[in-house]
C-alpha cells in the first residue's frame, strides 16, 4: 500500500534549501516532517502537492536522515536518487552537499552512500550505450527532439496525402486527430509520442502484427481497427527510419535496453549486493511507464513485491 503524504504548505523563504539540516528540520511543516520521519522502508511513499510546497527538500532530508541513521547503527545502506533532468539532479546534489558529513555519504565507497543521477544517464550507463549513440544526452532534450521528429513525420504524411488515403477506412475520431481545426498539432504530436513509446516500444516487439493485436488504452490514440493501427504504425516506421538515418536511439530505446539487462540472470544475482536499499524519484510525473518500470529492478530484495521507493509528483 502507498503511504500518502501531502506537502501542502509552501516554504516561504527562497533560501530555505541552503539552510543547514537542523534549521530546515525545525522549519518543516507537519506534512513535510511526515515525509522525513516516515518509518516504513518497504512500502512506496508518495509525496504530492503543487510546485513550491517543499516536496524535493523533504525527499533530500529523508535521504539524509536514513543515511545518518544507518551510519549511527553501523549498518550498510545504499540509496539512489533519481531526477528527470541533469540540472535538477545537480541542484539536488548541491543541496545535499550542504548537510553534515555529506562528503562521506556521496562517496561510492562508503558503507552508507547516495548516488544522484538521472534515470536516463543510469539506463544509458547500465546498458553500456555510448553517449554519441543517443539523440540527446539529457532526457528532457531527448524527448523534445522526439517531438520534433514526430512533427516532421506528421507533416510529411499530411503533405503526401497518406492520411487522406486512409480516410474511408478510419473512424471520424481518429481522423479528427489529424485535422488541425479539431485537434491542436501539439496534442497530436504528444499523443503519437506516447503511442510510440509506451504502446509500440513498451508493449510490443515493434512489429505491425503484435501492434494490431494490442488493446488500446484509455489515454492513448483510439485506434481500434486494423487500418487505424496500420496508419499509426506507418508513422512509427517513418520515425524509426529517421532515428536510423541519424544512427541514434531515443530515450525509450535506451530505457528498454536497460530493462533487458536489469531483468536478466547476471543482474538478478548481483542485485543482493549491488542493488539499492532505498530509491528516490523526484518529479515522478515526468517519467513515462517505460521509465517507471526501471524502479522494479533496482532494490536489493528480489523477493518483495513492493518497492522501497519514495517519489514526489506535482498535482
Name what the model sees in each region:
Residues 1-315:
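The feature marks helicase ATPase cores and/or their adjacent C-terminal helical subdomains
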Amino acid at each position: 500500500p502507498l503511504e500518502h503524504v501531502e506537502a501542502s504548505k509552501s516554504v516561504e523563504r527562497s533560501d530555505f534549501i541552503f539552510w543547514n539540516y537542523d534549521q530546515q528540520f525545525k522549519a518543516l511543516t507537519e506534512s513535510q516532517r511526515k515525509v522525513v520521519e516516515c518509518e516504513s522502508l518497504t512500502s512506496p511513499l508518495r509525496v504530492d502537492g503543487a510546485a513550491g510546497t517543499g516536496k524535493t527538500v523533504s525527499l533530500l532530508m529523508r535521504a539524509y536522515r536514513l543515511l545518518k541513521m544507518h551510519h549511527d547503527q553501523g549498518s550498510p545502506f545504499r540509496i539512489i536518487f533519481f531526477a528527470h533532468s541533469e540540472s535538477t539532479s545537480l541542484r539536488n546534489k548541491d543541496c545535499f552537499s550542504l548537510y553534515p558529513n555529506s562528503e562521506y555519504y556521496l562517496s561510492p565507497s562508503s558503507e552508507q552512500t547516495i548516488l544522484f543521477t538521472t534515470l536516463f544517464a543510469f539506463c544509458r550507463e547500465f546498458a553500456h550505450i555510448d553517449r554519441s549513440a543517443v539523440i540527446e544526452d539529457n532526457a528532457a532534450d531527448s524527448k523534445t527532439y522526439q517531438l520534433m521528429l514526430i512533427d516532421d513525420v506528421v507533416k510529411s504524411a499530411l503533405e503526401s496525402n497518406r492520411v487522406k488515403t486512409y480516410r474511408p477506412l478510419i473512424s471520424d475520431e481518429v481522423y479528427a486527430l489529424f485535422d488541425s481545426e479539431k485537434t491542436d498539432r501539439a496534442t497530436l504530436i504528444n499523443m503519437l509520442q506516447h503511442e510510440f513509446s509506451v504502446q509500440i516500444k513498451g508493449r510490443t516487439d515493434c512489429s505491425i502484427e503484435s501492434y494490431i493485436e494490442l488493446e488500446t488504452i484509455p489515454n492513448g490514440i483510439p485506434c481500434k481497427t486494423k487500418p487505424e493501427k496500420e496508419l499509426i504504425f506507418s508513422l512509427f516506421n517513418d520515425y524509426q527510419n529517421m532515428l536510423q538515418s541519424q544512427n541514434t536511439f531515443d530515450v525509450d530505446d535506451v530505457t528498454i535496453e536497460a530493462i533487458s539487462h536489469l531483468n536478466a540472470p547476471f543482474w538478478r544475482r548481483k542485485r543482493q549486493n549491488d542493488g539499492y536499499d532505498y530509491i528516490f524519484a523526484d518529479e515522478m510525473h515526468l517519467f513515462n511507464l517505460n521509465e517507471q518500470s526501471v524502479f522494479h529492478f533496482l532494490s536489493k530484495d528480489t523477493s518483495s513485491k513492493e518497492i522501497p521507493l519514495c517519489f514526489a509528483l506535482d498535482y
